[in-house]
Amino acid sequence: MRVRVLFFGMLKDLAGRPSDTLELPDGASVRDVLQHYAIETPPFKESLAMLAVAVNQEYAGAETALKSGDEVALLPPVSGGSGRPVGRDAASGLPSGRASGLRASIVRDPIDTTLILANIKRGDDGAAVVFEGVVRNQTQGRRTLYLDYEAYEEMARQQMEALAEQALKEFQIRDVALVHRLGRLEIGEVSVLIVVASAHRAAGFDACRWLIDTLKRTVPIWKKEYFEDGAVWAAGEPFPAEIRP
């Protein structure tokens, strides 16, 4: 059988390509894909303990069986945080009118925090908590010129949407919006925005903190940091054990 393999972040650099077509015997599993690349590309072996695997945009274990035509994504640890760009709403990170119920968006245009906050707030809210992740000008003493974000886009949007839904169930909040920007970002620009509306501030703060912490560990988005003396993919923590194959 034949499967399509996708590489992201540092794994894309190690492989020297963004994707591959891999021939496997019938009955093969995710483990067979990992073993193949550990042999073909030795540096992959050092990353196996930290990466996650998605099959058809869902996290998968090592024993997950594959079938012909599957899309297998090899995901290095994430380092941060699909909008449909139609008019100002989408460009600012909101699905148009929010009538579709979508609470998560991935965009390439600047994020308009004021507009998104205005769309979220309602008269019966007692608090609106806003978190902006901003591009800073240095990392561990190295001067940063700019950042470049990439994502496994559709899966990332789905994961962000799932986080929003989970937050609505687990915290006493009324509404939430998550937006992450991709592409080149300059110093001071907003890379990720979370807005939480609630009756009381404590629930809003708790939900916002949980959302950004979980997004940064589980949503497949990576950033490359460009310095005066070179560029590197930002190191992320290993995926949670329940996600890793």
What spans do the regions from the language model cover?
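Short, conserved charged micro-motifs
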Residues: S29-D32, A202-D206
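Ubiquitin-like/PB1-type beta-grasp interaction modules and other compact soluble beta-rich domains
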Residues: M1-V86, S96
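N-terminal, polar/charged subdomain of small-to-medium soluble alpha/beta proteins
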Residues: R4-L6, L14, K67, E71-P77, ...
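Glycine-/small-residue-rich active-site loops that bind phosphorylated ligands and cofactors
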Residues: A60-G61, A199-A203
